[in-house]
């Protein structure tokens, strides 16, 4: 019997893993689908990466992902690449002497055995989406970019193992190439929102991963997505900012944040200043929202608040990005329950207290957590009476 689920709110999860040498995220997708009598379809996953071209900040790319459905057609998860997972792959390839003179090639430095595992790159996200819409994730590589080439009425050029499309003036539109060796191994498990039975639902995904020998990579994290709607108020938003600034060290200690995780960071001091100023002046939510939006926050912080800064976000969630990498469902939901209790405290209009001076950060966070859980119990008791 699974352990009682400590988590009670609708939550989506992103769990970063790494396939063993010779396996892939596709292998895990097929294993999970088989265990549920379901199916797997290939989809595109969009992300960005630093550009090696001088003067160009980043490329956008589409890479192969695998969406899993059970026998009823219900989505279980999507498995995608995560470009932050690099150290284990680099270390394995270095140990195997990949790339050295005389090396004959091995599973670590051979491309993905799937001949149609490709990625599409562009420096313009709109063009990338158009390329994906006109190509389709299940297109054979020899036909990749045919669709967007027809849109611009130009040919697809082949340069070695690269397919590319340029407009009539020679400006790059998009290019496609095989997935680099090793990039089939990173596996971010992205779940749909889970309303109940979180531990059991996660174990249905992580059990097969453990059986196949999947690992927690060096840079791994687990991200939580919770409904953003309740946090669209001045008191709630202010409390969230105070939680992730004043109690940052304590949160990292209690949750066990991975110091090697990338694409996280402290909320800027300017945000704290704006929130405190607007709160004291009696600002309403639209005014605070506009003031914070002007700061240009990114998602790559300890907590991603960007969805709260618009009333029509593509994904209406608050994203917590500081849980460590884990391969056990109960470990994940146990830490997620801590986050849930603290965020529910943020919904209480009473201002979140500042950490007491001279008290160690972890101890201060535990005191706040105890208060948050006591408030939870007080809310639950009338319903049980």
What are these regions (language model features)?
Residues 219:
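Active-site histidine-anchored catalytic micro-motif
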Residues 1-215, 229-385:
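C-terminal accessory/tail domains of diverse enzymes
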């Amino acid at each position: 019997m699974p352990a009682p689920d400590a988590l009670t709110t609708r939550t989506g999860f992103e769990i970063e893993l790494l396939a063993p040498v010779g396996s892939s995220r596709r292998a895990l997708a097929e294993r999970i689908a088989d265990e549920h009598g379901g199916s797997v379809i290939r989809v595109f996953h969009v992300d960005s990466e630093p550009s090696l071209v001088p003067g160009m900040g980043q490329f956008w790319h589409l890479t192969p992902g695998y969406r899993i459905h059970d026998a009823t057609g219900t989505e279980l998860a999507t498995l995608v690449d995560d470009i932050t997972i690099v150290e284990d792959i680099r270390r394995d390839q270095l140990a195997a002497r990949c790339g050295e003179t005389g090396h004959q090639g091995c599973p670590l430095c051979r491309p993905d055995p799937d001949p149609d595992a490709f990625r599409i790159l562009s420096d313009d996200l709109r063009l990338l989406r158009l390329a994906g819409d006109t190509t389709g994730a299940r297109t054979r590589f020899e036909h990749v970019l045919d669709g967007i080439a027809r849109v611009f009425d130009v040919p697809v050029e082949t340069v070695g193992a690269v397919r590319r499309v340029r407009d009539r003036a020679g400006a790059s539109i998009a290019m496609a190439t095989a997935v680099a060796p090793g990039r089939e191994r990173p596996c971010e498990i992205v779940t749909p929102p889970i309303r109940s039975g979180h531990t059991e639902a996660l174990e249905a995904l992580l059990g097969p991963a453990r059986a196949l020998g999947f690992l927690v990579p060096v840079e791994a994290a687990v991200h939580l997505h919770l409904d953003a709607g309740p946090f669209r108020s001045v008191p709630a938003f202010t409390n969230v900012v105070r939680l992730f600034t004043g109690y940052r060290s304590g949160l990292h200690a209690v949750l066990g944040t991975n110091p090697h995780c990338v694409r996280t960071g402290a909320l800027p001091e300017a945000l704290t200043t704006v929130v405190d100023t607007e709160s004291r002046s009696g600002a309403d939510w639209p005014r605070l929202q506009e003031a914070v939006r002007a700061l240009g926050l990114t998602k790559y912080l300890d907590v991603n608040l960007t969805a709260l800064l618009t009333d029509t976000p593509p994904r209406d969630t608050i994203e917590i990005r500081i849980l460590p990498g884990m391969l056990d469902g109960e470990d994940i939901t146990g830490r997620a329950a801590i986050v849930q209790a603290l965020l529910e405290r943020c919904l209480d209009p009473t201002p979140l207290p500042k950490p007491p001076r001279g008290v160690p950060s972890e101890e201060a966070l535990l005191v706040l957590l105890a208060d948050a859980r006591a408030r939870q119990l007080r809310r639950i008791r009338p319903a049980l009476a």
